[in-house]
Amino acid sequence: MRNRTVAAGAVLTAALLGACTSHPPTHISSTASVTVNGHDRTFHIVKCGQVQWTRMIDIGSEFSGAKVVVDENAQPATTQSVRIRNVGGFSGMYSQGGDGNADMSMTGDKFTVSGTANGYQTDKPSEPAAATFKIVVTC
């Protein structure tokens, strides 16, 4: 009986420690819209996560979509980076301190990010291109 009590205690301790160190579940939003050079695209796969004051928003798939990183500790909150993957025939990025720009507004859990990104047209990957973008997502 003592061995069962010790074993049960060990299992309970391991479960509690595992719960303390696991990451919170990723919030999945219903939809996001991404507009690049006037081409609108709606995505139904949106994953939002947060580490301390940094919010990561992953839209779409690895083949087509966008990833937005927001610094919510800044006053006001700012967009650190935007990576666009094959939306409207464009792939590229904006990075804070680099070329391009990004303006962000946040109302509750709704983020709107718009600006310009540098990259390439997917049908002409060897030629640099710039694009305007607007991303609206709720996390």
From Swiss-Prot:
Its main location: membrane. InterPro entries: LpqH. Coiled coil: none annotated. It is found in: Cell membrane. Keywords: Cell membrane, Lipoprotein, Membrane, Palmitate, Signal. It is a lipid-anchor. A lipid is attached at residue 20 (S-diacylglycerol cysteine). A lipid is attached at residue 20 (N-palmitoyl cysteine). GO terms for cellular component: plasma membrane. It holds the Pfam family Myco_19_kDa. Residues 1-19 form the signal peptide. Belongs to the mycobacterial 19 kDa antigen family. This is Putative lipoprotein MIP_01412.
